[in-house]
């Protein structure tokens, strides 16, 4: 096996172990020493691949956000209807429980020190949420006393509750 392949496999092993630990404990409680001890990862190998806890978390976030985007947009890559979007969120949670927990933690309870690093990825999903909601509103007939702004605020609230549910479900 070539050196590059070994390095890639070691890196994947670390990421897989970290995904589980971050999903189980969250960013704030996660400890690298514990990860190394529980999963038999040498600290030197971990620090050769990642600069520390935040770098490892950001790598897990990137992977989780990529998987989420693939599931949410579906095969056609188009903005889904609200019903399809919610179903795909649930599908993401079912298929990728660790990734979904990390994803929802990043969306709802972003670690303060990583907000700037995670903001571009969050923006992609916030924009997708807006597009899904706009699509729903454009296809709906609103009551006279409800304008688009109020409808959007209501839909955002529902989405926040939905994400919170998946963050707290174990």
What residues fall within each predicted segment?
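N-terminal intrinsically disordered/low-complexity leader segments
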Residues: 1-9
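Helix-turn-helix
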Residues: 13, 21-55, 59
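Short amphipathic alpha-helical elements of helix-turn-helix/winged-helix folds
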Residues: 17-21, 92
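Short coil/turn segments at alpha/beta junctions that flank glycine-rich nucleotide-binding fingerprints
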Residues: 24-28, 96, 139
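Hydrophobic alpha-helical connector segments
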Residues: 59, 72-98, 148-155
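Short, basic, alpha-helical segments at the C-terminal edge of helix-turn-helix-like DNA-binding modules
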Residues: 62-68
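Amphipathic alpha-helical packing segments from all-alpha helical-bundle domains
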Residues: 69, 113-141, 149-153, 157-164
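Short secondary-structure transition hinges
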Residues: 90-130
